[in-house]
Swiss-Prot record:
Residue ranges: DNA binding: 26-105
Name of the protein described by the UniProt record: Nuclear hormone receptor family member nhr-153
GO molecular function annotation: nuclear receptor activity; RNA polymerase II cis-regulatory region sequence-specific DNA binding; zinc ion binding
Subcellular location: Nucleus
Amino acid sequence: MTPPQKSKPKRNRRKIYKILPQNQCPSVCQICRNPAIGYHYEVPSCNGCKTFFRRTIITGRKFKCFKVSNCLDGNDVIDTSKRVCRACRFEKCVQAGMNPMAIQAEAKTDEGEELKKLIAKKFENGEKLNDGTVFFNVHDRLNQILGKLIKIETKLEKVHDNGMPMGFLDQRDLSTALSSKVIYNNMEIPSMSYTPVKISKNTGLPKRRSRNFVHSSCLASIEYSKTFDFSSAIDISSKIILLKNTALSCANLTNAYTTFRKLKSDTLLYPDGSIYGPPRRKNGPLIEKQRSFLQNTLISFMTNNVDKTEYILLKAIVLCNPAIIDLPYADSKHIQREREVYAQCLFRYCLLQHGTLHGPARFSALLSIFNVLENQQKEQKDYYLYIKLIHSQKHKDPEVLKKKCISVIYDQIMD
């Protein structure tokens, strides 16, 4: 026979107001020791502590004591007209036995519902809350996500802004680039090849070299994608499908933001200040059309006066695109979950910045930039295909065609 299992001791949850004399109002609040006005959530308390506990549970707020978590200890009456440590006040409410399940109002956030259930479970099992238990409110969650994205953006600025090392070529394909570790400086690109300086036949002088900012901006988008949670959950083939559909749009967003906020220009520029697109000496209807559609995202940024936070969240949403047809369903779900987080953050940010009246309209205006991005990406790829076709007819030698290509990675993205 197996010995009988010991039952887990349960905390006595008999309601305090049922063991005290009838028709007698408690005199002291068990949290702040001010005069009590009655029993609230099964504990003698004042109106202030009752409201504080209810509001904390409903919103799921997070508080932190900056001392030693004993701000409300002792027997002295707490002056609630002054600022009281909210972390210690809430801990005192829990220790006194306030029952979150007695709150009739529903929690307004997932964090609030989680907090409510956790405290109720601890009470049932006769346990105490762990020291340092953390619950995020909306502001904390927004700041946490933004902090992570800003850190990533800052670290990848060198990849986008510095261009390729002069005279060096990145000859990797998209699969190889995605399989390697994240790089934060173009000098770290593995297996770069060096191209000797060419001498002009006409002048006898060395030809001007390009830093290939077009390639480095797309490379920055690829490195950016590796920092997201979904990157470790989906396979390499899904990553390639995703980047072929999103890398160029992310690069266009970064180019527009760099021009608008950093270089303070109303014409799209490369990070070194030179004009983006075909050289000024080239002209013609197709060239002018290209110059025109390259400005579209920048125009949207200027029209909507997009700030840094909005840009960073928009870029994350653009990258996390689960609606790509060829993506496997399981992989698209990973991407969708992450996209929903960034979309919610952008909506919350719009509400914080523009209020409940104008916030939703601001959110819609920012999302409308996606249409501009989609159209610009389509025009860029169509134009690239056209130019590629012309070169293939003009140059039959594959080696010559290879030299005309910006990079293997860019060619795959534009395909």
